[in-house]
Amino acid sequence: MKAQPTLIALGRIIGVHGVRGWVKIHSECRPREAIFNYSVFQATRHHHAQTLKLLDARRSGKSLIALFADICDRDAALQLNGFTLNVTRADLPQLKNGQYYWTDVLGLTVINRSGEHLGKVCDIFETGANDVLVINKDGQEYLIPFISERYIDRIDFENKYLYVDWQMAWTDDAD
């Protein structure tokens, strides 16, 4: 039996646009429009999956909208609401040595220079100045600036560890 490829979520269908089958897209890509560099998505919602082929896409005001093959009217578009738009790892552009995707960092165990386990990376977000890691430990979340050579010592993807120069005392919510 062939193993299923790991899917990487690039965005989500969040609504309809007009009456001709267009849908609104929330993109997790940076820049947002990069989601339209892909022509085929494995769309998933709960236990349902289907392949969607992109026919056309554009900005509409502040929104991103897309038209998929065989989605010809508003009713068909409404059926897609809530679907996550995924691609396989093989569909992503090849990275240079030392580069990685955010999805690779999610779930890593964070360890500081003292060997203290700080939790797991549960999210990453942009601030404009730098990206920020959201770390979850025992249900409590705190933030670490994602700045290489300042707070990030190294990433060990093989063993799923992220080593940081960070002390819990620097976190306002630390006990």
Swiss-Prot record:
Signal peptide: none annotated. One of its GO terms (cellular component) is cytoplasm. GO terms for molecular function: ribosome binding. It is found in: Cytoplasm. Residues 97-170 form the PRC barrel domain. The keyword Protease does not apply. PANTHER family: RIBOSOME MATURATION FACTOR RIMM. The PRC barrel domain binds ribosomal protein uS19. HAMAP family: Ribosome_mat_RimM. An accessory protein needed during the final step in the assembly of 30S ribosomal subunit, possibly for assembly of the head region. Essential for efficient processing of 16S rRNA. May be needed both before and after RbfA during the maturation of 16S rRNA. It has affinity for free ribosomal 30S subunits but not for 70S ribosomes. This is Ribosome maturation factor RimM.
